[in-house]
């Protein structure tokens, strides 16, 4: 039962952070930012937010981390939870890793 509650909270955070970033974070207006996933700690105190950017990933990640206080404040006004977790933005590199694995598999196929 606890996992269902945790997943529900992760979904609530994901939906609202995506909206806040796309509509309200001024220094990312010219960049396509996609929130790929959320991982909320079991004690609800920390939240890793996995994102991808259309360009300048490291620079935009810094901008997003600078805006994390503002985003947390906006979340608190929307969600009305007793405690809003600290937000930690991270670049999601799953796509790049999957491409690398595919390339390795193709090389193995060619060798046979």
Curated annotation (Swiss-Prot):
Pfam families: RBFA. It is found in: Cytoplasm. InterPro entries: KH_dom-like_a/b, RbfA, RbfA_dom_sf, Ribosome-bd_factorA_CS. GO terms for cellular component: cytosol. Its main location: cytoplasm. Keywords: Cytoplasm, Ribosome biogenesis. GO terms for molecular function: ribosomal small subunit binding. It comes from the Bacteria. PROSITE patterns: RBFA. One of several proteins that assist in the late maturation steps of the functional core of the 30S ribosomal subunit. Associates with free 30S ribosomal subunits (but not with 30S subunits that are part of 70S ribosomes or polysomes). Required for efficient processing of 16S rRNA. May interact with the 5'-terminal helix region of 16S rRNA. NCBIfam families: rbfA. This is Ribosome-binding factor A. It comes from Mycoplasmopsis pulmonis (strain UAB CTIP).
